[in-house]
């Protein structure tokens, strides 16, 4: 699990926090720790403690810890919300690759519709505690089933009408 608040252990440095994930699932072969550290652009902070790094770096360290555990099911709550735009897209591409290659079933909670549509194979729109639409991302985006979903996606829709 990776949460928006990062949930890093304050008494561990970044590297120790990430390695904690590896201890959770030694039986499954997963991604290498050095590859994760490089692709998440946190190699320059591995010796620092959580209070010494930015929120984006902490979020990436938390994501690395979660991925390193190579789980069967992964819950991500706003996993990229604090990440700088300069490498957010690169991380999305690599994250999708890892989740696909490692066959990790992932539930992603996000307000970023691009992120949901890019990373997801299924997409659910929940408004006011109710599931309004659940489908593949293409259908949710191109064929929203209600005005509520259209408004949530922040895009206009042309409706043929006679005046």
Indicate residue ranges for each PLM-predicted region:
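Internal alpha/beta loop-helix hairpins
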Residues: 100, 110-163
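Short helical segment in ABC ATPase nucleotide-binding domains corresponding to the A-loop/adjacent helical element
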Residues: 15-23, 30, 47
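Conserved ABC ATPase signature
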Residues: 49-53, 57-59
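A short, proline-enriched helix->beta-strand linker immediately N-terminal to the Walker B motif
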Residues: 68-72
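Conserved ABC ATPase "signature" region
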Residues: 28-45, 97, 103
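Hydrophobic anchor residue at the start of the ABC signature
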Residues: 63
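Catalytic Walker B motif of ABC-type/P-loop ATPase nucleotide-binding domains
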Residues: 74-78
């Amino acid at each position: 699990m990776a949460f928006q608040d990062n949930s890093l252990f304050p008494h561990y440095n970044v590297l120790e926090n990430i390695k904690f994930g590896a201890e959770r699932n030694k039986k499954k072969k997963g991604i290498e720790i050095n590859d994760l550290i490089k692709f998440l652009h946190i190699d320059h902070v591995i010796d620092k403690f959580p209070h010494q790094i930015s929120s984006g770096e902490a979020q990436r360290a938390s994501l690395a810890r979660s991925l390193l555990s190579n789980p069967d099911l992964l819950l991500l709550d706003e996993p990229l919300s604090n990440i700088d735009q300069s490498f957010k897209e690169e991380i999305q591409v690599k994250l999708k690759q890892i989740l696909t290659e490692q066959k990790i079933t992932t539930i992603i909670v996000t307000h970023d519709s691009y992120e949901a549509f890019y990373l997801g194979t299924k997409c659910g729109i929940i408004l006011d505690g109710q599931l309004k639409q659940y489908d593949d991302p293409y259908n949710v985006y191109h064929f929203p089933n209600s005005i509520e979903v259209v408004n949530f996606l922040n895009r206009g829709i042309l409706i043929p009408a006679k005046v």
